[in-house]
Curated annotation (Swiss-Prot):
Its EC number is 1.14.-.-. It comes from Oryza sativa subsp. japonica. GO terms for cellular component: membrane. It is a single-pass membrane protein. GO terms for biological process: brassinosteroid homeostasis; brassinosteroid metabolic process. Belongs to the cytochrome P450 family. It comes from the Eukaryota. This is Cytochrome P450 734A2.
Length: 557
């Protein structure tokens, strides 16, 4: 009995000790987590403010948890509540990047802002941008985008890092060489000509001899055609079905992006979130079937006819087929023979759909709006198109390089209304820039592309005016500094698809100028705004009147 009682007491004592240790551990973990949270949400921001203040860099004060977000949201909301004034002004920076424009006037071109507890240092000097993107690029990397942003743009080339990024970039670059892109010109040209014929028929049916269309909506079909062919090549029909679903998914993700400040919103089983999840599963199943079919063809040695377009999906699959054939002989790290996993192929298809479609759509939209606003430049560009291409012939690969005026107009469009108004880099190590500024590791740098493009220090007093003539001697000589024009980024991470965007935009505008006079509609409200990319807040309704000199049934070969 005593032994039993003693055993019970011993067992109780042991249980108490375990409970005490567990409680102490729980308290320690709680205190440790609390200390880390306090450091991340309060003490680290204070240290960084002091660090940069000692270097003469200031900014709006950090507020617990929210940082500068409340002020930023208020400034952006106020700016977007009214259109541009005057309505033909191109001084869009105060509207598009209202927080940057406001705080720059107070703190100068370099200041510290807080996206919650995450600090970002603004850098707008071309020489420092050269360091960040070129001469010291190994010290910086792309920042980690928000999960909702990654859902929109995919975990493809845009968001990859290190060796994986290098492999994908090497494999995919082949698709965007000019010789390969030229093979798309007939396909894109016929698509644009069909669109023009539809607008011509609408103008005739309307009785007024002209038609109003929202080009921000209509151009999406043209750019989707091009990016589908670039991504899927001979599997175009299958790819078109997949990208139709991807377009719906983008619409849902865009709505979720607007609610990005609501914690956990993307996980809530709302009706649209459930539809989004279902679409994502179906897209993945469809792409898996397509990749499997194309992979089987690659294994059997089936290839497209010589001289056909080298599409993105084919390049990724062929890289894997080459790896299987060669057995990764020699074990070359990240050689093109290294296979790209199927999951990565899925993400690349999503990335190129978003980046390729939206970037080119926005470039085309703003270029058309600008030509409608500036009929003198529209007429100059039209005369050039007629001189080079004639009135009825679809522009060819031989024609496009000769359209110099149109090229100048595209560059000026990209300067005034760049697709991405800012870009962000993260310091991988502690870095001292050439001007002495010390950047701590993990610090994010915000490069305001639009602000640089509108800066009178580099572009002169007419920086906010539409003047394509500034690009008469090329982009590198258009400003006082060659790196004051970076619409597609800079360095090794420059947009891989920029050649496709430029080619498609130039070809589309040439065909439309052959066929229409373009005017702004009374319904057009000039209100550029940003949601990831720059776009017209209220659409872009323009009036197209068919040119009487153009044969109504001529849509090219």
């Amino acid at each position: 009995m005593e032994e039993d009682g003693g055993g019970g007491a011993g067992w109780g004592w042991a249980t108490w000790r375990v409970a005490a240790v567990a409680a102490a551990a729980a308290v320690w973990v709680t205190m440790h987590v609390a200390a880390r949270m306090a450091d991340a949400l309060w003490w680290r921001p204070r240290r960084l403010e002091a660090h940069f203040a000692a270097q003469g860099v200031r900014g709006p004060p950090y507020r617990f948890l929210l940082g500068s977000v409340r002020e930023m949201v208020a400034l952006m909301a106020e700016a977007s509540s009214k259109p541009m004034s005057p309505p033909t002004s191109h001084n869009a920076l105060p509207r598009v990047l209202a927080f940057y424009h406001y705080w720059r006037k107070i703190y100068g071109h370099r200041f510290l802002i807080w996206f919650g507890p995450t600090p970002r240092l603004t850098v707008a000097e071309p020489e420092l941008i050269r360091e960040i993107f070129l001469t010291r690029a190994d010290a910086f990397d792309r920042y980690e985008a928000h999960p909702v942003v990654r859902q929109l743009e995919g975990d493809g080339l845009v968001s990859l890092h290190g060796d994986k990024w290098a492999l994908h970039r090497r494999v995919l670059t082949d698709a965007f060489y000019p010789d390969n892109l030229n093979r798309l010109i007939p396909h894109v040209g016929k698509s644009v000509a069909a669109l023009a014929a539809k607008w011509g028929a609408m103008a005739e049916a309307g009785g007024s001899g002209e038609v109003e269309v929202d080009v921000a909506e209509w151009f999406q079909a043209v750019t989707e055609e091009a990016i589908t062919r670039a991504t899927f090549g001979r599997s175009y029909d299958d790819g078109r079905v997949v990208f139709a679903m991807q377009g719906q998914l983008m619409a849902f993700a865009s709505e979720a992006f607007r609610k990005v400040l609501v914690p956990g919103y993307r996980f809530l089983p709302t009706k649209k979130n459930r539809l989004s999840w279902r679409l994502d599963r179906e897209i993945r199943r469809s792409l898996m079937r397509l990749i499997g079919r194309r992979s089987d063809e690659a294994e059997q040695g089936e290839k497209a006819d010589d001289g056909s377009f080298r599409d993105l999906l084919g390049l990724m699959i062929n890289a894997g087929a080459a790896a299987a054939t060669r057995g990764n002989a020699g074990g070359e790290k990240n050689s093109p023979a290294a296979a790209i996993p199927v999951e990565d192929m899925l993400e690349e298809c999503k990335t190129f759909f978003f980046a390729g479609k939206q970037t080119t759509t926005n470039l085309l939209t703003w270029a058309t709006v600008l030509l409608a606003m500036h009929p003198d430049w529209q007429e100059r560009a039209r005369r050039e198109v007629f001189d080079v291409c004639g009135a009825g012939e679809l522009p060819s690969k031989e024609h496009l390089p000769k359209l110099k005026t149109l090229g100048m107009i595209m560059n000026e469009t990209l300067r005034l209304y760049p697709p991405a108004v800012a870009t962000i880099r993260r310091a991988k190590v502690d870095v001292q820039l050439s001007d002495g500024c010390m950047i701590p590791r993990d610090m994010e740098l915000l490069v305001p592309i639009m602000a640089i493009h509108h800066d009178t220090r580099y572009w002169g007093p007419d920086a906010s005016q539409f003047n394509p003539a500034r690009f008469a001697n090329g982009a590198s000589k258009a400003a006082k500094h060659p790196l004051a024009f970076i619409p597609f980024g800079l360095g090794s991470r420059m947009c891989v698809g920029q050649n496709l965007a430029r080619l498609e935009a130039k070809l589309t505008m040439a065909i439309l100028l052959q066929r229409f006079e373009i005017r702004t509609s009374p319904n057009y409200v000039h209100a550029p705004t940003v949601l990831m990319l720059l776009y017209p807040q209220y659409g872009a309704p323009l009036i197209f009147r068919p040119l009487s000199s153009h044969p109504p049934d001529s849509t090219g070969p």
